[in-house]
UniProtKB/Swiss-Prot annotation:
It comes from the Bacteria. One of its GO terms (molecular function) is structural constituent of ribosome. One of its GO terms (biological process) is translation. Pfam families: Ribosomal_L21p. One of its GO terms (cellular component) is cytoplasm. Signal peptide: none annotated. InterPro entries: bL21-like, bL21-like_sf, Ribosomal_bL21, Ribosomal_bL21_CS. Part of the 50S ribosomal subunit. Contacts protein L20. PROSITE patterns: RIBOSOMAL_L21. The keyword Metal-binding does not apply. This is Large ribosomal subunit protein bL21.
């Protein structure tokens, strides 16, 4: 059984036992988290009906908080000596999917 969930503006295909890396979620490692925005569930049959999907929940556990790769930004203006360097690392959360409730 798998589900497609939406969190942090992105969609993820998850199954029980998977570890996914999503945009930072509030909570400490070990805390339970519910991913309620379920877009599709495929088990015995494929479910895409919004009324049935409203009953489905994907539960998980926060495994760790990490950072993404370093992104370097360099701004430059010609003939003025203007250089601006900046870096960014996106905070991420690793979530271990513990279950997909069918809502039946």
């Amino acid at each position: 059984m798998y589900a497609i969930v939406k969190t942090g503006g992105k969609q993820y295909k998850v199954a029980e036992g998977d570890v996914i890396e999503v945009e930072k979620l509030a909570g400490a490692p070990g805390d339970a988290v519910q991913l309620a925005a379920v877009l599709l569930v495929d088990g015995d049959d494929l479910v895409t009906d919004a009324a049935k999907l409203a009953e489905v929940e994907v539960s998980g556990e926060i495994a760790a908080h990490t950072k993404g790769p370093k992104i370097r930004i360099h701004k430059f203006k010609n003939k003025t000596g203007y250089h601006k360097r900046q870096g960014h690392r996106q905070p991420l959360t690793q979530v271990k999917v513990t279950g997909i409730s069918s809502g039946k």
